[in-house]
Amino acid sequence: MTRTAESGMLVAAAGVAAFGVTLVILAGGQTIDSRIGLTFAVMVAAFGTVHMAIRRWAPSASTVILPPAALLTAISLAEIHRLDPVRAGLQQWWLLIAAGMTVALLFFLHHRGTAAIRRYRYLYLLTGMILLLLPLLPSTGPLPVRGLEVNGSRLWLVVDLGITEIRFQPGEIVKLLMVLFLAGYLAERQSALAERPRQLGPFKFPEPRQLFPVVAVWAVSLVVLVVQRDLGASALLFGAFIGMIYTATGRPTYLLIGGVLTASAGYGAYRLFDHVERRFLAWIQPFQNFEDAGYQVAQAWFGMGTGSLAGSGIGLGRPDLIPNAATDFIYAAVAEELGFAGSLAILAGFALLIGVGFGIALRCRDRFRKLTAAGLTWVLGLQAFLIIGGVLRLVPLTGITLPFMSYGGSSLVGNFLLLGLLARISHEEPA
């Protein structure tokens, strides 16, 4: 696909967002106003700016990275506008900020290249650990920065700027830093990790000392789970690492080890933390616990059940009855109002992004770039699976965001930077 065709698809995605907002306004019996043009302009400005930056500083990058992300964002803006117009306005501001930060990243990588960022892997680890601990700061006090607990998990950082406050979720940046650290670490130790001199029954295992990084990252994930009480970030962090180590070695033994450690950590969390137990109950018995833990999931299923093939129509359903519909349950809201067709569009968008990401990783000859591309794709894919799977009751609810769709500035920034890294890697390792 040419860059011209890519730009046309981005404009079309902006049109989808504007059309969706138009339907929301008409469904509410309101008069057509400037919100439609503003939504279109913000989409064109954000994705157009990133598109031009890629043309300038990564011209050989894949042309199939931005369009699916633009489609997902377009559907999201329309649905968030339907659920909460104030949040929709804030999401548009965050979209512009995310695009600006991605342009800055592409400019930096144009001058330094991905080889330069490989040298600072331990700095990424240190920075990531500091960011993970920042939400543990006291919620009150004289400091302009403080932690904030939401829904039983301590994930948020609040920065007081005097005239306003900014809430940010450091974990969205930590996932990128951890991928960069692990890619640098595994690129150096790929051969040693691939060796399997010890055998236990039908399974072959590497030397115990080679398993140290697996256990260490599992321990870090447990710290996140215990201290921040965040099941989603813990599962995402460890799952992405297991995916990366499997990519580096091609040994399914690591998937087995990762599965055992994940199951044991999940069981421990279920027994130790009330809010994790509630999420398991919502997963297993949502309708039996309708008045309590299962209310959110049950309402989501009722809504999706009314969606049928084409949905009730955007602005005509009742996704507002689902708690946290704009964040945790945006997929259920879209499924109700756009039906199976809208759900399929979301799944197709993620499938395309994941396929492109792994395709970039497979083409890479450099180990670091290969593992970075694979790690970023594992993060994106696992995050989408955990939240959509939670809504569909394939896995317990984790409370993480759906990339490019859930309301939240930190999520949008983190995922746009992820796209920027993938674009740069695909430029350096063209098809």
Q: Residue ranges of each PLM-predicted region?
A:
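N-terminal membrane topogenic signal
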Residues: M1-G15, A61, R209
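Transmembrane helix boundary and interhelical junction motifs in multipass membrane proteins
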Residues: D230-A235, G311-I314, A325-T327, L344, ...
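Hydrophobic alpha-helical transmembrane segments of multi-pass inner membrane proteins, especially
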Residues: D33-A293, A332-G390, L417-L421
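Juxtamembrane "helix-exit" motif on the non-cytosolic side of transmembrane helices
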Residues: L23-G29, I80-L83
